Amino acid sequence: MWALLHLRTLVAMAIALVALFVGGVVLQAAGEAKAQSTGKQMTTASGLKIEDTQVGTGETPKTGQTCVMHYTGWLYENGAKGEKFDSSVDRGDPFEFPIGTGRVIKGWDEGVASMKVGGKRTLIIPAELGYGARGAGGVIPPNATLIFEVELLGLK
């Protein structure tokens, strides 16, 4: 009797683990599909707003890989683009950074991590995922929301 009860418990635990794993995979796939929907804005749990303008067809970056990007950044004021503060496109010089290592603002690490090479995306980054209360170099004021148009050109 005890052996049968023990066996039932093990089987129930195995079923629960499989359901948890499958459910997690389904939820992850649904989240990725939602993030990849062209023209539809999504907001992540952190408050980052993402809108794909062109879904890429290449690889998705892995932590530590170098992302080769073009970008243009503006202040985001009253629901619209404000003053442009930087652009690799204008310079004709792509920007490179290792993803997921904290070398860029949090909004970039989060917003670029699910892109595919060839993709273009708009990121609306709240201050806490950008430069926060300190701002940046007299160009970005304290507590500024930022908007970036980014393009993942390649991975190294």
Segment roles from a protein language model:
Residues W2-K156:
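Cross-family detector of peptidyl-prolyl cis-trans isomerase
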